[in-house]
């Protein structure tokens, strides 16, 4: 289990998004996940990996179902400066959130039809579409993608908060 008392605020600027107690819990959770499901490891704790996925989905948003105070919709991670402006405009400070409760509630929603079927196999590859040596020819039935909005969307800066939680330096990700 996560020792919630172990969380130390490493980035004070994130207090624009989170109540201090919430941010400490997020830091404790980040550490717990990093110990059990390190990125790039061959063998990770699938429960910790699941919790990371759910937590990243709940980092910021515009309702009490997110860890942050009121922000933009979750697909629009704003900068610290923009979040401070939102807080000032609304006259609010981020409220304390129940990190474990939010993760549990979202997990129940995601698994409302039961567990993920064991036969479902998926893989994530980051490489040019024309060069995927780890995928056998004629073995793919469906590819789901989003069109690149390279002139509109700034993927690294738009995902900075998710990268922080996952322990990824946005500049290190090739886009």
Say what each PLM segment does:
Residues 1, 132-133, 140-143, 148-175:
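SAM-dependent methyltransferase catalytic-core segment centered on the flexible catalytic loop
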Residues 1-37, 168-174:
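Conserved phosphoryl-transfer catalytic core
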Residues 3, 16-17, 65-66, 148, ...:
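Intrinsic disorder/low-structure terminal segments
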Residues 21-145, 150-153:
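SAM-dependent nucleic-acid methyltransferase catalytic core
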